[in-house]
Amino acid sequence: MEIGLREWLILIGIIVIAGILFDGWRRMRGGKGKLKFRLDRSYANAPDDEGGAEVLGPSRVLETHKEPELDESDLPSVSAPARERERDPKPAKASKRGKRNHSEPQQGDLNLAAEAREPDLFADDKDDFVADNNRHGAAATPSTPVKELPPAEEVLVISVISRDEGGFKGPALLQNILESGLRFGEMDIFHRHESMAGHGEVLFSMANAVKPGVFDLDDIDHFSTRAVSFFLGLPGPRHPKQAFDVMVAAARKLAHELDGELKDDQRSVLTAQTIEHYRQRIVEFERRALTQKR
């Protein structure tokens, strides 16, 4: 059978069309492979762990939500909580009689038992402490009337701001600070005493950094706050440097376990240099106090 020109043209057209289709299919397949390769490389350059996402977390919160007010107007007066009790002459005499060994664990290896206090100083509130501790897990404050010391000359503040938009939830927050030895007390805020059980002088306190600055234990299950502030007033505890170390440990524990960010009294990120500067302020205050006594 003889093939004419028309048949040849049809055959050539079919071959050309098949070649075009094959070339297009080859290019599409090659493009898919190249796209997949690029996506894999892009993913490989992503942050290795969730730590990177946590670093970016605070920026998103600060851009979309106003940072909680942490100035002194939002905090309760530190003249009373930082120094709830003035030591009577009796404890001084008791300290000469001997030393008392504490059986309760002391956070941050704090040992303030060198100077014993009058054993009966907290006897009046023993029953209240037991009852309130069974109900809330927090110690009640002594009911004995006390004389307040002069207002604080120095206040060391460490704030913990939640990275979560929902803030710190009441039950988790309460559990965390109870583990650090803080107990609910006067002014409806938490205080850290020498003893983990809530006895002894107040070392430092923790307030709600958002107005009105207090906590409601009766509604703690529905409570939440964007930030809390730990503060230590000077003059205050007899051993301010050790008390400050305990406060730093409690703030770090809260920030680590509840995903918070540490801030100083200027609302800047708390650094090792800032902590050292706080310690230097304590040293300078003690030096001035000694000079005034002379």
Swiss-Prot record:
It is found in: Cell inner membrane. Residues 64-111, 126-146 are annotated as: Disordered. The chain crosses the membrane at residues 2-22. Keywords: Cell cycle, Cell division, Cell inner membrane, Cell membrane, Membrane, Transmembrane, Transmembrane helix. GO terms for biological process: division septum assembly; FtsZ-dependent cytokinesis. Residues 1 are periplasmic. Belongs to the ZipA family. HAMAP family: ZipA (MF_00509). NCBIfam families: septum_zipA. Interacts with FtsZ via their C-terminal domains. PANTHER family: CELL DIVISION PROTEIN ZIPA. This is Cell division protein ZipA. It comes from Pseudomonas entomophila (strain L48).
